[in-house]
Amino acid sequence: MRKIAILSFVILAFTFTAFGQKTKPAKTTSAPAATNDQPVRDAFDRLVEGIKQVDAEKVMSVYQNSDRILFFNNNGTATIGWETMKKNREASYANAANVSLDITGLRVEMLGKDAAYITCKWKQQQEYDGKLETASGRMTLVFKLIGKDWKVIHLHTSPDNPDANRPVLTSERERQ
């Protein structure tokens, strides 16, 4: 009986010792690779500045000039092609003034050395045809490194409350 008591005591002592020890995390020899998302952020900032300045040329310079580029628009429609989107921007910017655009929750995710995406919330206020408008929503932009420049290759915007009174451009209408 005495041997069982001693054995139980030893087991109990080892149990307390094992659970009571504090362990230090193992040191790693290599740090995780740092990602440089600043060039992507810079391209995004140029886009935002172009919108605030109501400058279609500046805005479109951030997008890849391709007839295959796809935009999911704020009004629930889709536009295909850089030229078409440029014409749409020029047409709508002719009626816009005093634009303010606030970006919150900006997140840049690098998908490798030549691809990234940005997600954010946006709130825009502007005069459109002389009337004050406010809109807000979420946006995802996919970027690709083309040559030395980061270009948007896809845009998806989702408004919080779409304005049913805003016109849908001919190029934005669904095709049969």
Where are these regions (language model features)?
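Bacterial N-terminal signal peptides
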Residues: 7-15
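Short, low-complexity N-terminal intrinsically disordered segments enriched in polar/charged residues
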Residues: 21-62, 170-176
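Hydrophobic/aromatic beta-strand elements that line small-molecule binding cavities or substrate pockets
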Residues: 89-90, 103-109, 122-124, 138-144
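A short hydrophobic beta-strand element
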Residues: 114-124
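Outer-membrane beta-barrel domain signature
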Residues: 128-130
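Short beta-strand edge/turn micro-motifs at domain boundaries
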Residues: 136-164
